[in-house]
Swiss-Prot record:
Protein name in the entry: cAMP-dependent protein kinase inhibitor gamma
Family: Belongs to the PKI family.
Stretches assigned to coiled coil: none
Pfam family name, one: PKI
Gene: Pkig
Function of the protein: Extremely potent competitive inhibitor of cAMP-dependent protein kinase activity, this protein interacts with the catalytic subunit of the enzyme after the cAMP-induced dissociation of its regulatory chains.
UniProt KW Repeat keyword: no
Top-level taxon of origin: Eukaryota
Example of a GO biological process term: negative regulation of protein import into nucleus
InterPro entries: cAMP_dep_PKI
PANTHER family in alphabetical order: CAMP-DEPENDENT PROTEIN KINASE INHIBITOR/PKI (PTHR15416)
Bias type Polar residues, positions: 1-10, 64-76
Alphabetized UniProt keyword annotations: Protein kinase inhibitor
Organism: Mus musculus (Mouse)
Span list, region Disordered: 1-25, 43-76
Amino acid sequence: MMEVESSYSDFISCDRTGRRNAVPDIQGDSEAVSVRKLAGDMGELALEGAEGQAEGSTPDKEASSQPESSDANTSS
């Protein structure tokens, strides 16, 4: 019971609010990343994701058609 009480008092004494398992505040130089650079990086991620989905969907269709044809061969 003492273990629970000590962790509770540690949590209450800290300056964090909200959910108990929330991410703590990030300390450091916040000026190191500019909004312009972040927006550019986000744009690149969106483009890479769209390309990856287009390429990734083609093999899935081929893979799904292969088991169907093999199932048809086994039931004949």
